[in-house]
Regions:
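N-terminal functional modules and adjacent low-complexity/disordered segments of proteins
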Residues: 14, 18-22, 45, 98, ...
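Active-site beta-strand termini and strand-to-loop segments that position acidic
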Residues: 92-96
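Sec-dependent N-terminal signal peptides of Gram-positive bacterial secreted proteins and lipoproteins
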Residues: 2-38
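Compositionally biased intrinsically disordered regions enriched in Thr/Gly
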Residues: 3, 33-90, 105-108, 112-366
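Glycan-recognition/cleft segments
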Residues: 97-104
Length: 366
């Protein structure tokens, strides 16, 4: 039977949510991002290698993030994009996925797998919508790379497991404090027993988290109501508890994902707790970090060395020296080409740096 990992805490401070940002490609920057472009951004021709075929596409590069014109995705990747002028919404469909971008808000709202997700805002310029390429395409089932020597962005369609991911949700009743937890359920996989085991575990985890979150915000709402009653000039925003998942790896009979649970109980901002799970779909069991690292006996040293190199290169500013990952219970998830080790906000970093993530390529464990 699978058991959830205990939540780790390095300090007494609890992790707080940071605004999600698209992972940057190593392309020169030209300006600061402006969602609905009030100033013209430089549109450049960028060479892409799409499943081995080279093509030049319109691109905007801002502060290390590459934005791609959505219109070019219709012919180049076979994705279907359309724009609804009435709702000011862009719809991107392909690989059994749909993403909706709501351009009516000052900062673009993204909806994926029936969930609202957060990322760098889209740019609208000269009638064309530009999206952060990595943020968009990794969610649509593509691997992204960058060849600095050739100055070429690589896009490869990922050969995924033959299954379907469905979004289920747990929602509070009318008149109750806001609870909305999304969680994935797998269907169509060949091994139905393993699939049922994974689904039961994910459902149980979501139910437990939703119940605990509901209790937490109910207590907070009661305290907030009392505080407002004592001070008529005080207004505290409504409390809430949300869970949003992202499948990060669906290959080679493995499934990896994380759920970000966000709790707002009043104050300047809320708290996020990330729970990651990696499954062997042939057994329905969770994989350990060492399992994911190809069983390497020295996996801790390999990961520590990679993290330290990334820190030396300025990836994050740790508030205390990094010594080693937690050998007993280190948080991680998989992506197309790497194991991603992560730490909670305030575990090593200040709030503004969000959840520190350190990708370690699979090739490091060969």
């Amino acid at each position: 039977m699978m058991r959830p990992k205990p939540v780790k805490k390095r300090s007494k401070k609890t992790p707080m949510i940071a605004l999600a940002a698209a992972i940057a490609l190593s392309v020169p920057a030209v300006a600061a991002p402006i969602p609905q472009a009030s100033a013209q951004h430089l549109v450049q021709t960028q060479t892409y290698a799409i499943d081995g075929t080279r093509v030049d596409l319109p691109t905007i590069n801002i502060d290390g993030t590459t934005y791609i014109g959505l219109r070019s995705l219709n012919t180049s990747l076979g994705l279907n994009t359309n724009y609804s002028p009435i709702n000011r919404e862009v719809h991107v469909e392909g690989n059994n996925r749909t993403m909706t971008i709501d351009l009516s808000e000052p900062v673009s709202a993204y909806f994926f797998n029936d969930q609202r997700v957060y990322g760098m805002s889209a740019i609208v310029q000269d009638g064309t919508t530009y999206m952060p390429v990595r943020f968009l395409l990794e969610r649509m089932g593509y691997g992204i790379s960058y060849d600095a020597a050739a100055k070429t962005v690589g896009i490869t369609q990922i050969q995924e497991n033959d299954l379907t991911i469905e979004t289920h949700k747990i929602e509070s009743g009318e008149g109750e404090p806001h609870v909305l937890v999304h969680y994935p359920q797998v269907s169509g996989y060949a091994d139905e027993e393993a699939q049922a085991s994974v689904n039961a575990f994910l459902k149980e985890q979501a139910e437990q988290r939703a119940a605990a979150g509901a209790e937490e915000i109910a207590r907070a709402q009661s305290e907030n109501d009392a505080a407002e009653a004592d001070n008529p000039d005080l207004t505290i925003p409504p409390v809430s508890f949300d869970g949003t998942y992202l499948v990060t790896y669906n290959e080679q009979d493995k499934l990896s994902l994380y759920v970000d649970y966000y709790s707002y109980t009043g104050g300047a901002h809320g708290i996020t707790d990330r729970a990651a799970y990696t499954f062997d779909l042939t057994t329905g069991e969770q994989l350990s970090l060492q399992d994911a690292a190809n069983g390497r006996a020295d996996y801790v040293e390999v990961i520590n060395d990679s993290i330290q190199r990334q820190l030396d290169a300025g990836a994050y500013h740790f508030m205390e020296p990094f010594e080693s990952i937690d050998t007993a219970d280190q948080n991680f998830f998989l992506k197309h080409d790497a194991i991603v080790v992560y730490f909670g906000v305030y575990e090593y970093t200040a709030y503004a740096e969000g959840i520190p993530e350190f990708p370690v390529p699979f090739t490091a464990f060969e």
